[in-house]
Regions:
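Acidic/His/Gly-enriched intrinsically disordered linker/tail segments
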Residues: 164-230
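Amphipathic alpha-helical surface "interface" segments used
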Residues: 35-37, 118-120, 197-201
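Active-site rim elements
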Residues: 2-5, 80-85, 163, 225-230
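Juxtacatalytic substrate-recognition/specificity segment
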Residues: 15, 40, 44, 62-165, ...
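Extended, low-hydrophobicity, Ser/Thr/Pro/Gly-biased non-transmembrane segments
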Residues: 1-54
Length: 230
């Protein structure tokens, strides 16, 4: 099983990668040099004080690069209806928010991958059918991107055991998501515009705000005795 929970101290990575010329490499490490000879491309890659080294290989470059202040953000999340300029503005807001809450990101690049999003989705939003959009334009993409970005941000900066301390990563991420929604989407309902439908608005769930879902999910786990003991 691909557990992705290798635990190691921050290390210096020196990687020499040789692959067919047609392949593209995307990584949050520094690509120092690229040489092409007889159809073979050789890259020299380096990362200092890194907890992990992640490389994405493909015949086409699917990553969108956005420069935010001194940080280069690489993202291949599925595009939404949000315009590229608005995605850049939202991403700048996310990075600023994380800088204020967690501290400045210590590296030059960070990757937000679709694979990480699928492994750690925003439950509820990812289950909505494509024709149903109860939230404001860009909200779903913004929250999905923030969850993946904040998780990567934490995993790359906190030297915690990915398996034993998984609960701490999760707790910090939930805290950040609650604060982010409170700051930029106050009064957002858990059902979005569906809470105004006559068949729903009479029920208690229509009054619940987006962040109320976390306490409700915890109470459900506690009631079923499946919550993690401290």
């Amino acid at each position: 099983k691909k557990s992705n929970d290798l635990y190691q101290r921050a290390s210096l990575f020196n990687i020499t990668l040789s692959l067919p010329e047609l392949f593209q490499v995307s990584t949050e490490l520094d690509i120092l040099d690229t040489n092409v000879s007889k159809g073979i491309k050789t890259l020299t890659i380096k990362g200092n004080d890194r907890i992990k080294a992640t490389l994405f290989l493909g015949k086409t470059n699917l990553f969108e690069t956005i420069i935010i202040s001194n940080l280069e953000v690489l993202s291949n999340l599925s595009k939404s209806k949000t315009a590229p300029a608005m995605r850049a503005i939202n991403l700048d807001r996310m990075v600023y928010f994380l800088d204020q809450k967690v501290g400045p990101y210590p590296f030059n690049k960070i990757v937000i991958s679709d694979e990480d999003t699928k492994n750690n989705p925003v439950y509820g939003l990812n289950q909505l059918p494509g024709f149903l959009s109860p939230f404001p334009t860009g909200f779903e993409y913004d929250i999905t991107q923030f969850k993946t970005l904040s998780r990567t941000y934490l995993e790359n900066t906190l030297l915690l055991h990915p398996r034993k301390d998984a609960w701490l990563f999760g707790a910090l991420q939930i805290y950040l998501m609650i604060e982010y929604v409170n700051t930029y989407y106050p009064k957002m309902k858990v059902l979005g515009s569906l809470s105004k439908f006559w068949i729903i608005r009479w029920s208690h769930i229509a009054d619940l705000e987006f962040n109320d879902q976390y306490s409700l999910l915890y109470l459900n786990m506690a009631r079923n005795n499946i919550h993690q003991p401290l």
